[in-house]
Amino acid sequence: MNSAIYPLGRLGVDDYLQGEQRAEVKHEYLDGQIFAMGGASRAHGLLALSLSALLLPHARRKGCQLFTADMKVRIDHDSGSWFYYPDLVLACDPTDREPMYVRRPCLLVEVLSPSTEHIDTREKLLAYRLLPSLREYLLLRQDSLQADLYQRAADGRWQHQRLTAPGDVLTLECLGADVTLSEIYVDLADLSVA
């Protein structure tokens, strides 16, 4: 199935969610409009898998759930709803158990690709900040050793940290976990970080 399973025009949330169960291609949803998502590169997949493997033991210890790529995040705002598919979603709220999406993530991760970088660094950055539960948003480049971490401070303001050296330590407060960039990028030897 593809986008043809969706009716033309504005789409309601229920129709979108039902369509996604049958769709062969994932779609993000922005106030009634759907946008098909493309496939990921090898580097993209390796980065997401590596970080997932590093974080999963911490998530289990904290009683959190870690999802990769196929879990939607729902953002409700004044004029409607948005659904995105982050590369990693960490949900630590035990009451956040919708079967098809997460409403209250603690951490969201996007691996940047050339076709989506402008969306991940602008649109999604602004949209994700609307989630009161979100404490951290991590962006990983797949073409160079670089991580951009946005963290919500106690006063509600967002702080940005860029890491670019193999030994730089990424501290994820949601999990109380520290990982180095070299651990995340271990499978990308062509970036000379392994």
Language model: regions and residue ranges:
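Gly/Pro/Ser/Thr-rich low-complexity, intrinsically disordered segments predominantly at protein N-termini
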Residues: 1-194
